[in-house]
C-alpha cells in the first residue's frame, strides 16, 4: 500500500487459499467484507478459506459483522449438494441463507469443525427484517457487477445463468437484472415467465448488447426482472 507501506496480498483466484507467506504476515486477521447473502457469492468462501488457514496456522481471527443486505428472515432456493463443491459453493446452505457475515463465520466454524480463536464484533441497530435500505447505510457495491440492492435481490435467482449460454447481464448497466441471448424471443420469454405466477416479481421483455462477457457486442433479447414485493418474492 503506497500510503502505509503495508504489504497487500490478493486472497482471490490462484491465491484464494492463504499461502505461508501470507500467514506469516500477521498474528490476528481482521475480516471486514460486505456479503450479499447468496450462497454462490465468493466472499463467503473468502471468509471460510481464511478461517481454515487461521485454524491451521494457529492465528486468531476477528470478524466485523455486517448486515445481510437482502434481509435476515428469509431463506430459499436449493441446498448445495456436497458432490458439487467449488469456490462458489462449499457449504450445505440454501441459495438465500439469511445470515449476517458474523453468523456465517460461526456456522462455518461449526460446519468445518474448526477450533480457531474467533471473535465476532456484533452489529448495532440492525433487526432481522431489515434490508439495507431500511437503514441509514449507503449501498457500496461489493463488486462491480452488483451495483444496486435490486441487483442483489435478482442475483439470488439469476446468477445460475452464469453456467449456461445465456447472458446474465454482465457487460450491461443491469447485471443480474436482465437475462437473454441472441437466439431468445423476448416476447415469448416474457409471456412464459409471467405465466408461471412467481410471487413478488414481474418480467418485462428487453434487448441489450453486452460490452464484455458472453455475447459481447451482439444484440441479445430476453427479460428484465423487477422485484415488486420483497416479502413475497421467492
Specify the residue positions occupied by each region the protein language model found.
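Glycine-rich oxoanion-binding loops at beta->alpha junctions
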Residues: 2-25, 38
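Short acidic catalytic loops
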Residues: 27-36, 62-65
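Glycine/threonine-rich flexible loop motifs
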Residues: 35-47
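A short helix->loop->beta-strand "cap" motif at the edges of active sites that frequently abuts
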Residues: 54-60
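Glycine-rich, charge-decorated loop segments at or immediately adjacent to ligand/cofactor-binding or catalytic sites
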Residues: 62-84
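Conserved anion/nucleotide-ligand pocket segment
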Residues: 84-156
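ATP/pyrophosphate-binding catalytic subdomain of soluble kinases
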Residues: 132-203
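Conserved functional hotspot residues or short segments at active or partner-binding sites
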Residues: 180-234
